[in-house]
C-alpha cells in the first residue's frame, strides 16, 4: 500500500473512531491513554499528513526517505492501534509523530526556500525602481507563503498566482548587467559613490531615480 493510500485510509478510520470515543468512561486509564493518542494524532500527525498530501498533489517534490519512513511508521501504529482497539506505547507514538513532523517540515521549508529564492531576489531588485512597491511586497509575501509548515492549499494557490504575475512583471525589467549589479548592491546596502559610473548616473537621471537610490558612505 502506498503512503498516499495509507494516509487516506488512516484519516477515514480516525474520523469514525473519534466520533465514538466519548463512549469510553472519561475517568478510566483506558480513556486517558485514548485521549493522549487522539491528542497526538490531532496535534502532530494529522497536520503533517494533511500538508504532506497537499505538497504531493501540487508538486513533484520527493521528501527524504528517512522522513517518509517515519511517517509510515506512525501510520502503521495508528492502524494497528485501531485494529486492536488498544492504545500501547503512546509516548513512543508521540515521539515518532513529532520527529516525522520536524523532519518533513524541515525538508519542505528548505526546498521551498530554494525554489523561490531567485524570483524573490529579482523582485527585491525590481522593487527599487517600481512605481508600485506595495504590489511587489504583496507578491513576495504570497510567494513566501509556501515556505511554511504546515502549508495549505490556499497558500499554494496564492503562490501560483503570485508567481505568474511576478514573472510577467519581471519581463519588463530590462537592465544591462552594470545597472543590475548596481541595483543589487543598492538593495543589499553595499552601493557606494565608487559605483556611480557615468552610465549609471545617466540612467538614474533619465529615470528620475535620484530620490530612490540610497548609497553607503564608507570611511
Task: Walk through the language-model features, giving the residues of each.
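Amphipathic alpha-helical assembly segments used for oligomerization, scaffolding, or translocation
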Residues: 1-196, 209-210
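C-terminal edge-of-domain segments
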Residues: 214-219
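Low-complexity, intrinsically disordered Gly/Pro/Thr-rich segments
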Residues: 196-204
Amino acid at each position: 500500500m502506498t503512503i498516499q493510500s495509507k494516509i487516506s485510509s488512516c484519516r477515514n478510520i480516525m474520523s469514525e473512531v473519534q466520533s465514538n470515543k466519548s463512549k469510553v468512561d472519561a475517568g478510566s486509564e483506558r480513556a486517558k491513554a485514548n485521549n493522549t493518542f487522539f491528542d497526538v494524532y490531532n496535534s502532530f500527525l494529522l497536520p503533517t499528513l494533511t500538508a504532506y498530501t497537499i505538497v504531493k498533489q501540487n508538486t513533484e517534490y520527493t521528501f527524504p526517505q528517512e522522513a517518509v519512513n517515519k511517517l509510515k511508521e506512525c501510520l502503521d501504529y495508528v492502524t494497528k492501534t485501531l485494529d486492536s482497539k488498544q492504545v500501547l506505547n503512546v509516548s513512543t507514538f508521540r515521539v515518532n509523530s513529532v520527529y516525522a513532523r520536524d523532519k518533513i517540515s524541515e525538508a519542505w521549508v528548505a526546498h521551498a526556500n530554494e525554489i523561490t529564492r531567485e524570483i524573490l531576489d529579482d523582485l527585491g531588485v525590481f522593487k527599487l525602481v517600481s512605481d508600485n512597491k506595495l504590489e511587489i511586497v504583496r507578491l513576495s509575501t504570497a510567494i513566501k507563503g509556501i515556505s511554511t509548515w504546515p502549508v495549505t492549499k490556499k497558500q499554494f494557490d496564492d503562490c501560483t498566482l503570485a508567481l505568474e504575475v511576478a514573472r510577467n512583471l519581471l519581463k519588463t525589467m530590462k537592465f544591462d548587467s552594470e545597472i543590475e549589479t548596481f541595483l543589487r548592491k543598492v538593495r543589499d546596502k553595499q552601493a557606494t559613490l565608487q559605483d556611480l559610473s557615468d552610465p549609471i548616473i545617466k540612467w538614474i537621471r533619465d529615470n528620475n531615480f535620484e530620490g530612490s537610490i540610497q548609497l553607503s558612505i564608507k570611511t
